[in-house]
Amino acid sequence: MSHYDLILRNGNVVCPDGVRKADIAVSDGKIVLIAEEIPGDAKEIIDAAGKHIFPGITDGHVHFNDPGRTEWETITTGSSALAAGGGVAYFDMPLNCSPCTLDAVNFNNKLAVAQKDSLVDYGFWGGLTSANLDKLDELAECGVIGFKAFACHSGIDEFPRMDDYTALVGMEKLAKLGLPLMVHCENAEITKELTELSLANNRTGVRDYFAARPPITEIENVSRMITFAEETGCKLIIAHISTAKAVELVAQARARGVDVYCETIGHYLYLTGDDVERLGTVAKCSPPIRDGENQLQMWGRLFNDNIAFVSSDHSPCDPKLKNGEFMRVWGGISACQTTLQGLLTHAYHDRKFPLVKIAQLTAQHVNEIFKIKDKGQIALGYDADFALVDLDHEFTLQAEDLFYKHKVSPYVGDRFRGSVSQTILRGTTIYKDGKIVSQPIGKHLRPHQ
């Protein structure tokens, strides 16, 4: 009789080819058997009857701000929040840690913190700016999963924006290195001029902010970045895409063979500009949240498989930085704990979006795109990463439920349908019934070349 480390019995397993009732056996942190019924014994047996077993999610876009801005968030608190939402891995952005991840020294400083403090697995983005073109090779050797650049001002002076020369030379280099570039796409000149004009005329409200960053700023820049990618052969990922027209540009480029993808974020699917007026600065982000008509079209693009993955763009700050006029306060939303629950509520329950596609958007595609081996789906030989979900459990998110350093989110007070009861990383339970139940066991994820 076979003996395993872990058996999950009687669950509804969200596999790449569909949802089916099955048992899952785990040994040495890997999935070794999936069958209707698995005989044998295990060190641990979990009865998952009534639960859906999703692949643990990988959040491709977080700002945990560690080291250097730990008064905003830390790897400890951020990774705990991710686990509470069914997360098993994240890719941390090269800002707003300080110093930014622009060379090997600062990569290794961040790595040392994560090795000590990260509850879940982690990968790191390197930065591409006008000041570090000579550092791309050393960052690639460190094992970055890709590079991040801003076409407009990043919000902090220590991470300069990518000008056209940097885009050309940088993308040529990254094409040779075989690593992707993710770009925050907003036209620098238009956003700068409109913002300055608005401030000069004391127009600092929610709608003034929207007017200073209109859809054309994203649409134009996405088009230009696609042109750079097409000419250089660099794999391109459009960050936090917010307009359906920009998604269409990506789909058209992919149809003609350009290696380009886009991610979107939950708040572009769940919130509208009217919600931002109601919620205030807690819902300020860049690009801004758009109107209801665009949101409806974004859902259409999601159903048509034009969006590769959904991330949180978790970007917290000291709450004091959210006090003041909307135009002037920090832009960023705290959301890494609610990505899966949000999609279960708004996609599956509200719009009958398939569970398999939710698993693809939150786990499978992001690991495939970034060449992370053995992660992102429930299949033989893959890491035993699971989120156990009660699909019909309804709850109201309370501030005290959040594991963030600051208990702040635009979703506090919202009603969700679909909750995570347990998160398992490589066969070890790390979160269960509202509590973190493991020491940090995260490992560094590198692209598999």
From Swiss-Prot:
CDD domains: L-HYD_ALN (cd01315)
Catalytic activity as recorded in UniProt: (S)-allantoin + H2O = allantoate + H(+)
Cofactor: Zn(2+)
Binding site for Zn(2+) 2: K148, H184, H240
Pathway(s): Nitrogen metabolism; (S)-allantoin degradation; allantoate from (S)-allantoin: step 1/1
Coiled coil region boundaries: none
Listed Gene3D superfamilies: Metal-dependent hydrolases (3.20.20.140), Urease, subunit C, domain 1 (2.30.40.10)
Positions of modified residues (N6-carboxylysine): K148
Free-text remark on how the cofactor is bound: Binds 2 Zn(2+) ions per subunit.
BP GO annotations: allantoin catabolic process; purine nucleobase catabolic process
EC annotation from Swiss-Prot or TrEMBL: 3.5.2.5
Changes after translation: Carboxylation allows a single lysine to coordinate two zinc ions.
Domain of life of the native organism: Bacteria
GO CC annotation, single: cytoplasm
GO molecular function: allantoinase activity; cobalt ion binding; zinc ion binding
Pfam families referenced in this protein's UniProt entry, alphabetically: Amidohydro_1 (PF01979)
UniProt binding sites for Zn(2+) 1: H61, H63, K148, D313
Family note: Belongs to the metallo-dependent hydrolases superfamily. Allantoinase family.
Function description: Catalyzes the conversion of allantoin (5-ureidohydantoin) to allantoic acid by hydrolytic cleavage of the five-member hydantoin ring.
Record protein name field: Allantoinase
Organism: Desulfitobacterium hafniense (strain DSM 10664 / DCB-2)
Gene: allB
